[in-house]
């Protein structure tokens, strides 16, 4: 395709130049107005920013004063809470002591009633035992005298409710050699608290007397046990 085939365009350069000049003038005015607006906006922004900063300073100062008053109030409130806590603790401690004293009083009262009942029961039991002993002694006095005179039985009070029974006339080489045991009579059931020399089956004998309540038979069994132990010791020496 050749240039001859394109249409011919006639340009009015003077008119185009005038239009471009007008456009440039309009655009320059637009730029100046926009610069002026930007400058005004900037100045307004700086003014508002200054006002905001001033207001912020005033607000911060007011906040500091408020915080100071709040701190003073908080310290005062904490002090009151501490004093209240101390008072409540003192009241609680006093109440605990009072409750403990009341419980202790109740416990002591219950223990007192319990021991009164035990003492009353023991007195009644002791009276029954003394009556039974009195009746038994009326039958056994001759036998007891025989035990004391011929079998070498002696009785000694060790301390309250504990009696020592001493046997002699067991060792043929030394008739004065003592074989003894101590028995506690405080409770209804007897209890051997010391035995010399020790008998291996003493617990069985104690259980027997507690079951039968035959104390004289118990003395016979204990003396028999000492004799058997002595004979066993002699046989081991031979």
Curated annotation (Swiss-Prot):
Gene3D superfamilies, from UniProt? Chromosome segregation protein Spc25 (3.30.457.50)
* Pfam families listed in its UniProt record: Spindle_Spc25 (PF08234)
Keyword check for Oxidoreductase, yes or no.
no
User: What keywords are assigned to this protein?
Assistant: Cell cycle, Cell division, Centromere, Chromosome, Coiled coil, Kinetochore, Meiosis, Mitosis, Nucleus
Q: Which domain of life is it from?
A: Eukaryota
GO process terms (BP) = attachment of spindle microtubules to kinetochore; cell division; chromosome segregation; meiotic centromere clustering; mitotic sister chromatid segregation; spindle attachment to meiosis I kinetochore
| Localisation | Nucleus; Chromosome, Centromere, Kinetochore
A GO CC term?
Ndc80 complex
Q: Which residues form a coiled coil?
A: 28-141
Keyword set includes RNA-binding: no
Q: What does this protein do?
A: Acts as a component of the NMS (Ndc80-MIND-Spc7) super complex which has a role in kinetochore function during late meiotic prophase and throughout the mitotic cell cycle. Acts as a component of the essential kinetochore-associated NDC80 complex, which is required for chromosome segregation and spindle checkpoint activity.
Family, per the entry? Belongs to the SPC25 family.
Q: How does it assemble?
A: Component of the NDC80 complex, which consists of ndc80, nuf2, spc24 and spc25. Can self-associate. Component of the NMS super complex which consists of mis12, mis13, mis14, ndc80, nnf1, nuf2, sos7, spc7, spc24 and spc25.
Q: Please report the name of this protein according to its UniProt entry.
A: Kinetochore protein spc25
In the UniProt record, the gene name given for this protein reads: spc25
